[in-house]
């Protein structure tokens, strides 16, 4: 069994589409996939989008807070408590199965408080002893944001499973073209996929075919080897 956490260098970088794409690619290789969203704020759109695009039927949100804000703010305004991160970890382990892949999509970036006592997705990764896949962009500023996220993982010895560019335009500008190259060369961390802008608007069968092309099959298979 394998647990892989998915985070972003910020919010809105394409974590959900990246999670769906990796899930779809794994399903097409015959891998049993579960997707978990430990914390959702606002509506439950992310889980529904992952299920729609990937075809994965085991998609679970552990807790949802009503307003689309940072988890601690949304929980506070609703008069609700944040879950303990060890509770989250226990629930995630219970979802995992032998020979299966469990993808855990975080909320916002790596150090967003999503559990009680200020705990973050990084803390959850440490409890689970699981690697983290980092979704980033090719936009101006991404090299700094990516470096900060990778450094935050490294300082706690949390392994990084690679980078994914969550949305790359069909007609990139100069900064986007150069950043795509620099993301691949600057950090010593492999870029696992570059997802075309607008991929989420594809019909699910087309999205699944694209996903197979985006991720190296050997890497995907190796996640549960």
From Swiss-Prot:
Give the residues the record marks as binding substrate: 41
**Gene designation:** bioD
Name the species this protein comes from: Mycobacteroides abscessus (strain ATCC 19977 / DSM 44196 / CCUG 20993 / CIP 104536 / JCM 13569 / NCTC 13031 / TMC 1543 / L948) (Mycobacterium abscessus)
E.C. no: 6.3.3.3
What biological-process terms (Gene Ontology) are attached? biotin biosynthetic process
- Summarize subunit and interaction data from the UniProt record for this chain: Homodimer.
The UniProt similarity line reads: Belongs to the dethiobiotin synthetase family.
Q: What is this protein called?
A: ATP-dependent dethiobiotin synthetase BioD
Q: Which GO terms describe its molecular function?
A: ATP binding; dethiobiotin synthase activity; magnesium ion binding
EC category name? ligase
Reaction catalysed? (7R,8S)-7,8-diammoniononanoate + CO2 + ATP = (4R,5S)-dethiobiotin + ADP + phosphate + 3 H(+)
Q: What does this protein do?
A: Catalyzes a mechanistically unusual reaction, the ATP-dependent insertion of CO2 between the N7 and N8 nitrogen atoms of 7,8-diaminopelargonic acid (DAPA, also called 7,8-diammoniononanoate) to form a ureido ring.
Q: Which controlled-vocabulary keywords does the entry list? A: ATP-binding, Biotin biosynthesis, Cytoplasm, Ligase, Magnesium, Metal-binding, Nucleotide-binding
């Amino acid at each position: 069994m394998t647990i892989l956490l998915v985070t972003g260098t910020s919010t809105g970088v394409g974590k959900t589409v990246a999670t769906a794409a990796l899930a779809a690619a794994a399903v097409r290789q015959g891998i049993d996939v579960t997707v978990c969203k430990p914390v959702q704020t606002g509506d439950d759109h992310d889980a529904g989008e992952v299920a729609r695009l990937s075809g994965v039927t085991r998609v679970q949100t552990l807790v949802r807070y009503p307003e689309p804000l940072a988890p601690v703010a949304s929980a506070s305004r609703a008069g609700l408590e944040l879950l303990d991160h060890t509770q989250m970890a226990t629930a995630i382990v219970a979802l995992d199965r032998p020979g299966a892949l469990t993808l855990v999509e975080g909320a916002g970036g790596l150090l967003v408080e999503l559990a009680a006592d200020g705990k973050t997705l990084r803390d959850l990764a440490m409890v689970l002893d699981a690697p983290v896949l980092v979704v980033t962009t090719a936009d101006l500023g991404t090299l700094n944001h990516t470096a900060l996220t990778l450094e935050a993982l490294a300082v706690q010895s949390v392994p990084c499973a690679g980078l994914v560019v969550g949305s790359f335009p069909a007609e990139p500008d100069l900064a986007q073209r150069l950043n795509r190259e620099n993301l691949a060369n600057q950090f010593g961390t492999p870029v696992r996929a570059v997802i075309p802008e607008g991929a989420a608007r594809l019909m699910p069968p087309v999205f699944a075919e694209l996903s197979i092309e985006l991720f190296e099959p050997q890497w995907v298979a190796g996640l549960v080897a």
